[in-house]
Amino acid sequence: MSSTALKSGKISAYAAVKVDPDGDYCTPGAFDLERLFWKGSPKYTHVNEVWPNLYIGDEKTALDRYSLEKAGFTHILNAAHGRWNVDTGPEYYSDMNIEYHGVEADDLPTFNLSPFFYSAAEFIHTALQNETSKILVHCAMGRSRSAALVLAYLMIYKNMTVVDAIDQVLQHRCILPNRGFLKQLRELDIKLALERRDNMNGTNSSEKTGTSTETEI
């Protein structure tokens, strides 16, 4: 990806992008991101710990109040909140010592999950500030919506690239965010890379590029 394209803010979703010309890392294109999931992952199970005290699970896990309490979960992030999805809400856990956060998202490539990246990541980060906390991030299958939000958390708060975040989670769980979510995570990767570069240079990314990045579908 040329510097001209990066400065214009128009970025092809299928081209690799190198934000730091002096660095080795390139944000992969959308197809290359999908290929990361081809190398295999653990057999699908209902719930897995993918980072210390951070778990990704499915609807069955979220509905099993007894097992949640027995396992010591203190926080739940439902990435499929809403009447037509996994309709739990804070009321479902009202008599339990569980803090709930809901994201009403559809598992569709056309759904824009990115507005929820930072709020969901903050919820996870705040929960994990207490070393006794355990957080479950779930959707219906625990593979796409919930996985995308956990990947965003690792990128935002743990300074991982999208590639590193995917590798981290794939070591522990079978995930496959839909192509639309992968494109949005790719945009986040570029944004965070710009911020890291400009923090090192003492400049503001929006001032340097003149605009925000926008992926061409």
UniProtKB/Swiss-Prot annotation:
Highest taxon of the lineage: Eukaryota
GO cellular component: cytoplasm; nucleus
Residues that bind substrate: H138, C139, A140, M141, G142, R143, S144, R145
Entry-linked Gene3D superfamilies: Protein tyrosine phosphatase superfamily
GO biological process, one term: protein dephosphorylation
Keywords annotated in UniProt: Cytoplasm, Hydrolase, Nucleus, Protein phosphatase
EC number: 3.1.3.16, 3.1.3.48
KW Cell membrane (keyword) present: no
Biological function: Dual specificity phosphatase able to dephosphorylate phosphotyrosine, phosphoserine and phosphothreonine residues within the same substrate, with a preference for phosphotyrosine as a substrate. Involved in the modulation of AMPK and MAPK1/2 signaling pathways.
UniProt family annotation: Belongs to the protein-tyrosine phosphatase family. Non-receptor class dual specificity subfamily.
Protein name (record): Dual specificity phosphatase 29
Upper classification of the organism: Eukaryota, Metazoa, Chordata, Craniata, Vertebrata
Gene it is expressed from: DUSP29
